[in-house]
């Protein structure tokens, strides 16, 4: 689950919201990663993995019947042997419903930074862990709609014993490229 505070810079107003987000890790060789590579004119052999993200949410200013449900897939192509930076392939962007390529990098605090430039706008996101079951995310969008958001995302585990083990270990044993 995700709690979000979005700041609309043009209107000088803030809006609260919540989302339910599902992140599924995609391993090298997954047919869905091959599709992403083809759509972005990249070699599938270069993709090391990725994820499929689905979400459903609501914002305070929503009108009746307005929906914030969607999904996207990501594929990662590292730029060097460390794997800490490289090309981020999406089957479609947030702003445009066409395949888009951006960049990913891990910063010195192991935060994941995603940057994507679109025709009329650009986005910058940073993800990091504040605890074994708490991920934080900031994002800014510049261009047609200038806004900034901060999200607290709480991992929901199906198995209570796994939740206790993850909490006592301090961090999950294996993190997917986009967390959890």
Language-model features and meaning:
Residues 2-180:
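Soluble ligand-binding/transfer domains with enclosed cavities or grooves
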């Amino acid at each position: 689950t995700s709690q979000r505070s979005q700041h609309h810079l043009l209107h000088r107003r803030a809006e609260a919201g919540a989302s339910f987000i599902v992140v599924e890790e995609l391993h090298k060789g997954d047919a869905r990663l091959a599709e992403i590579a083809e759509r972005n004119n990249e070699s599938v052999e270069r993709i090391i993995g990725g994820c499929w993200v689905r979400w459903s949410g609501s914002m305070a200013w929503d009108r009746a019947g307005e929906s914030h449900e969607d999904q996207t897939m990501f594929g990662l192509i590292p730029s060097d042997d460390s794997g800490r930076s490289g090309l981020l392939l999406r089957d479609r962007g947030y702003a445009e419903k066409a395949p888009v390529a951006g960049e990913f990098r891990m910063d010195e605090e192991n935060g994941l930074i995603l940057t994507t430039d679109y025709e009329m706008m650009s986005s910058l996101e940073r993800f990091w862990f504040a605890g074994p079951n708490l991920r934080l995310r900031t994002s800014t969008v510049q261009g047609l709609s200038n806004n900034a958001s901060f999200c607290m995302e709480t991992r929901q585990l199906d198995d209570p014993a796994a939740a206790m083990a993850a909490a006592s270990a301090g961090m999950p044993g294996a993190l997917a490229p986009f967390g959890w």
